[in-house]
Amino acid sequence: MNFKQFLIESSIFKNFDGKKVIVAYKLFNMIDGKLYPLYVNAKKEIPLHKWIDAEIGPVISDGKNKGKIKTNGKLGGSVALRPGWHAGDHPVATHIGEPAVPKGKPAYRRDSEVWTEVYITAEIDYQDQANKNGTNKQGKIIKKNADLDYIPKNGYYRYKTNSNMLGDWIIGGSMYVNRILTDDEVEKINKLDSEKDGIVYKDLPRRPR
């Protein structure tokens, strides 16, 4: 089986380990050969080849960020209460990375950041509930509001921060990290997806040395 055929056969849904899963991509920090989340529970190692249930991080109880989740990654701060494993349907995250100049926009993929191929449980599709939460009084779905404030146990839903976002976030209740991708594999996957969808998917490059 060539690389392109492998992608076609594994890019949507498949049965794995007795579960219905969706294949997705997740960015991690790699420190001393071990994987760690970028933001929430960033000090907790994530093993390869093992199912891990999502957990809700520490919720901020007061102040201007009350109700958000406290992060302990490189940047600190907080994120919205949107529990679950966050992955994407393409290995692209141009909003995360190292700026070329102080306080600039992300321009480079950090040396410690690696893409992985992950499986997200897909036994239950929570999309209808997420869309219901994001529907306004006029019946229009506001995508940035179409989420859940609880972990989608045994399932997943798709989420967009805005309509211009490339691809979707896939938010799931359980995750299995299947393998770490090389930069060449990331480039090949995005190139093939670009040809298939007619959209240019391109992740940030590494900083030139």
What are these regions (language model features)?
Residues 1-8:
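Short acidic, low-complexity intrinsically disordered linear motifs used
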Residues 3, 87-88, 182:
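Short low-polarity hydrophobic stretches
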Residues 12-68, 94, 104-209:
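Active-site and NAD+-binding cores of ADP-ribose-processing enzymes
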Residues 74-100:
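Extended catalytic/binding region for NAD+/ADP-ribose chemistry, centered on the ART fold
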